[in-house]
Amino acid sequence: MKYQWKDNKKFAFTIVDDTDGASVETIQPVYDCLYKNGIITTKTVWMKPPRDYFPGDSMEHAAYRDYVLQLQRQGFEIAFHDIGSGV
């Protein structure tokens, strides 16, 4: 069975962002650049705050959640990383 890529493309390339260490301050410049250049990726998120040594915001943090939802509206795929780091 041969897979037919969209628009008869020869291959697909994907980028998935690991959410460890993510905050609006650390990811916004990256996602602004990606969006400006037409590169749409997958952003992973934690639902709960980390409970170990990994820093980063979760969907319980209002500003982060709002930004992630903005990314989704821009076409970025939002994926469940885990309930939270160390949970």
Where in this protein do the model-derived segments appear?
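Catalytic alpha-helical scaffold of carbohydrate-active enzymes acting on polysaccharides/glycoconjugates
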Residues: 1-87
